Curated annotation (Swiss-Prot):
Residues 1-22 form the signal peptide. This is Mesencephalic astrocyte-derived neurotrophic factor homolog. GO terms for cellular component: endoplasmic reticulum; extracellular space; synapse. It comes from the Eukaryota. Keywords: Developmental protein, Disulfide bond, Secreted, Signal. It is found in: Secreted. Required during the maturation of the embryonic nervous system for maintenance of neuronal and cuticular connectivity. Essential for maintenance of dopaminergic neurons and dopamine levels. Disulfide bonds join C28-C114, C31-C103, C61-C72, C148-C151.
């Protein structure tokens, strides 16, 4: 009876230890969010076949930008990718493995996958645009897929952002 009790305690402690070591979303935010978003875009038939998942991921990557684009590059989802560990994503996805576990496996293969971080979003409703750097103003326009033709001075960029703010501000709320 004592050995059974001791074995049960050891199993519980091992389970607790494993959950504390498990990868958290904030530790690998770009990977977890991208894998979740991609997985939710798949239909049931595609989810079951890892080859179809790989084809779908390559198609998905063509539309990605910024951090997600870099994530695709690291996995081999882009034509110009130097390496390819796409099967480390596709096979676990076909087994319905959670995004956190998939990213944990990917991190073991390539640690830089979890080095990707989203930049903090600028709250356009509360920020003073005059205090931002031109680089940040350009980034706001770039994130909106907008340009500022003929903008040379900081005031030109601010004026353009103010013009476009009503179109994009509803996304910021």
């Amino acid at each position: 009876m004592n050995t059974l009790h001791m074995l049960l305690v050891i199993c519980c402690l091992a389970g607790i230890y494993q959950t504390t070591l498990a990868l958290k979303e904030e530790d690998c935010e770009v990977c977890v969010k991208t894998v979740r978003k991609f997985a939710s875009s798949l239909d049931d038939a595609t989810k079951k076949d890892y080859k179809l998942i790989e084809v779908a991921f390559k198609k998905y990557c063509k539309t990605q930008k910024n951090k997600e684009h870099r994530f695709c590059y690291y996995l081999g989802g882009l034509e110009e990718s130097a390496t390819g560990i796409l099967n480390e994503l596709s096979k676990p996805l076909s087994w319905s493995m959670p995004a956190e576990k998939i990213c944990e496996k990917l991190k073991k293969k390539d640690a830089q996958i979890c080095d990707l971080r989203y930049e903090k979003q600028i709250d356009l409703n509360n920020v003073d645009l005059k205090k931002l750097k031109v680089r940040d103003l350009k980034k706001i326009l770039n994130d909106w897929d907008e340009s500022c033709d003929g903008c040379l001075e900081k005031s030109d960029f601010i004026k353009r952002i103010e013009e476009l703010k009503p179109k994009y501000a509803h996304n910021e709320l």
